[in-house]
A protein has these predicted regions:
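A short glycine-leucine-enriched loop at secondary-structure breakpoints
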Residues: 68-72
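Short beta-alpha junctions and helix-cap segments that line functional grooves
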Residues: 88-91, 102
Length: 151
C-alpha cells in the first residue's frame, strides 16, 4: 500500500487496442450477403479509431475488384459507420440485400456510381434503394482475426 505520494502505485497501462464488431464478408467484386454476428470481435489498434470502437466494424474482403486500392482478397478492413455518400471515398454499400466495397463517384447529374479499382474501369450505378453502410478506414494487419467475445 502506498503512502499517498505515488509510492507503491503502478498505473494501469493505457489500452492499445479497441474491440470492434466483426461483420463477416464484404464483396470486392460482385455484391455478396452480409451476415452480422455481434458475438465476434477484432482487436483494432486505437490509433485507427478516431471516436469510439462502437462507431466501427470489421469486414473480411472477398474478391479483387479493389486490388488497385491495395485492398486484396482476404483483407480484414476497418469500416467507420456512415450513411453519407462521399465523392472519391471507398465505402461499403448495401445493394439488393448484399454489401460491396467500392469507390464512390458523384456524376454530373448528382447521381452516384460505384467504381471498381482493378484496372477494368467497371462501374455500378447507385440507385435510390441502395444504402451507404460505412467508410473504409484501413486494411488491418494480417494478425487481426475475429474471436468470440469473452475469449
Amino acid at each position: 500500500m502506498g503512502t499517498g505520494d505515488g509510492e507503491g502505485y503502478t498505473a494501469e497501462p493505457e489500452p492499445k487496442y479497441g474491440r470492434v464488431m466483426y461483420c463477416d464478408d464484404v464483396a470486392a467484386g460482385p455484391p455478396i450477403w452480409q451476415v452480422e454476428d455481434a458475438s465476434r470481435v477484432v482487436d483494432v489498434p486505437l490509433r485507427l479509431i478516431k471516436t469510439k470502437p462502437e462507431d466501427y466494424y470489421v469486414l473480411l474482403v472477398r474478391g479483387n475488384s479493389m486490388i488497385d486500392a491495395l485492398i486484396p482478397d482476404g483483407s480484414m478492413v476497418l469500416i467507420r459507420k456512415s450513411d453519407v455518400p462521399e465523392h472519391g471515398k471507398i465505402q461499403v454499400i448495401w445493394i439488393d440485400d448484399r454489401v460491396t466495397l467500392k469507390r464512390m463517384r458523384e456524376d454530373e447529374d448528382h447521381g452516384w456510381t460505384l467504381c471498381y479499382e482493378d484496372g477494368t474501369r467497371r462501374t455500378i450505378p447507385l440507385g435510390n434503394k441502395n444504402l451507404i453502410q460505412g467508410d473504409f478506414v484501413a486494411v488491418l494487419p494480417p494478425l487481426s482475426r475475429p474471436y468470440m467475445r469473452g475469449e
